[in-house]
């Protein structure tokens, strides 16, 4: 069991005890708990994209921000005009991102590694949607502009995608062990983590389940790797200077997140 699985297991234990003590957690409390964790750990994990990208690529700061904001603007326009297809694209991109981050602990030096990332990511996303389809369909009814997404959650393709990606993930792990990209011990550690994620998505409401994964596995892993990378390229990096680097873009992200939420609730 790696450290992220251990932290994740502890978080599951804590949530179980909360349910045991108070019974069902109402929706507002779920949102409060989840949003607090995401604000503290989830959003900051992407706040160093500029530093990380500029340290690995020969591009000016202006060019980076111009391209970064241009992509965001194009996606915003696409969301306004084609929300259904834009949401599907968002799920696919998220799947790849989660897969790439998940395997950052291993040195996968082969051409098909992107296939590994997308397969694992699709397994994660399809598990989340497949195991919580009924809850997702109900949640989409809260807002007029999200009702159209209910057809995604009720579509049989989610079930097919879940079972296909589960099978491919098992085959993929066996392949990685066979090619010695990961050890047998790593494989069992991955299977155990998959099991924890699956159980979390199955037992808990989707907001709680996804937040536990997003914060305690994905964000913590990303923050750890970002810290270790910066320690290699900057001599004076410590915990407190690392936190200071996270603050500027985190504040900007909080501001735009607030604007989006405000617009959604007042639509």
Regions found by a protein language model. Name each.
Residues 185-224:
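Membrane-water interface signatures at transmembrane helix termini and the short loops
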Residues 147-161:
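Short aromatic-rich membrane-water interface segments that cap or initiate transmembrane helices
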Residues 58-62, 66, 73-151:
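Membrane-interface helix-loop-helix junctions at boundaries between adjacent transmembrane segments
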Residues 115-136, 158-176, 192-206, 252:
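Alpha-helical transmembrane segments of multi-pass integral membrane proteins
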Residues 12-18, 67-76, 98, 191-200:
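Hydrophobic, membrane-inserted alpha-helices
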Residues 17-29:
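Short, hydrophobic transmembrane alpha-helix segments
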Residues 37-46, 91-104, 216-226:
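Alpha-helical transmembrane segments and their membrane-interface exit regions
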Residues 1-11, 58-63, 243:
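N-terminal membrane topogenic signal
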């Amino acid at each position: 069991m790696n450290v992220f699985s251990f932290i994740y297991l502890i978080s599951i234990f804590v949530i179980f005890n909360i349910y045991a003590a108070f019974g069902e957690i109402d929706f507002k409390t779920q949102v409060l708990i989840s949003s607090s964790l995401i604000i503290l750990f989830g959003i900051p994990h992407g706040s160093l994209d500029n530093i990380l990208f500029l340290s690995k690529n020969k591009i000016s700061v202006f060019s980076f921000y111009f391209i970064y904001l241009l992509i965001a603007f194009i996606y915003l326009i696409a969301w306004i005009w084609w929300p259904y297809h834009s949401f599907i694209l968002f799920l696919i991109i998220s799947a790849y991102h989660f897969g790439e981050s998940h395997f950052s602990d291993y040195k996968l030096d082969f051409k098909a590694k992107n296939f590994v990332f997308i397969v694992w990511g699709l397994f994660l996303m399809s598990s989340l949607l497949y195991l919580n389809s009924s809850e997702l369909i109900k949640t989409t009814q809260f807002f007029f502009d999200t009702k159209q997404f209910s057809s995604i959650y009720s579509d049989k393709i989610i079930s097919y995608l879940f079972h296909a990606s589960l099978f491919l993930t098992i085959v993929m792990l066996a392949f990685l062990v066979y090619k010695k990209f990961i050890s047998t011990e790593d494989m069992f550690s991955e299977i155990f983590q998959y099991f924890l994620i699956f159980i979390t998505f199955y037992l808990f409401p989707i907001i709680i389940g996804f937040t536990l994964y997003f914060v305690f596995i994905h964000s913590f892993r990303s923050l750890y790797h970002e810290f270790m990378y910066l320690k290699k390229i900057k001599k004076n990096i410590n915990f407190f200077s690392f936190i200071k680097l996270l603050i500027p873009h985190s504040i900007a992200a909080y501001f735009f997140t607030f604007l989006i939420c405000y617009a959604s609730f007042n639509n």
